[in-house]
Amino acid sequence: GSPPPDVIAQAHAAGVPVAALAGSAKHALRHAEIGVDIVIAQGYEAGGHTGEIASLVLVPEVVDVVGGKAAVLAAGGIGTGRQVAAALALGASGVWMGSAFLTAAEYDLGARTDGGPSVIQEALLAATSSDTVRRKIFSGKPARLLKSRWTDAWDADDAPSPLPMPLQNVLVSEAHQRMSQSVDPSTVAMPVGQIVGTMNKIRPVAEIMAELVSGFEAATRRLDDIRST
């Protein structure tokens, strides 16, 4: 839902801008009308909590309905400079990225077996774009997760139904903590977007950012070339 108006007022009084995620144009408009400064249009491809509308459809819908009431950032399925260029072409003011940084060299969560990538990163590096599922098992609300033995267990015919939010998170939080320290990549229970299929090596954040810039420039040059022919 939208942030409470009194919280927005307190943040604004302290000079702090307020951002909120939206999975539909309806949610985005509600955010903008109560004073949210930045609406993050998060498409179906994204990791974690997502709606059912893909970014290519959602972002321009949100841009159109919000108008000039708030800035719009695109999220979901963005991990390269080409995708940044596409998001801006759809009308977004910028992008909101998360999954692409999970395989950064600076990422420091999860067990390590030999001083190399964490077990979490090993699981992410091995995944394809088809290796995610959208389930309620993480928090009680639909969230995109890495497919694993954990998600398979919840998909079994004899598995219980997830509890409503926030009870599901209370139920599984201890299990998530244990799995985060496991040395078995097949048990990793990690929110991640479909972009995981392109996350195939460990790189410093500086290199990730440099490739975003160079990829964006290459994409826009290509468009310029197309226009000039």
Question: What is the meaning of each model-derived region?
Answer:
Residues 52, 57-73, 79-229:
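Conserved active-site-proximal phosphate/metal-binding subdomains
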Residues 1-73, 80-99:
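Alpha/beta enzyme core
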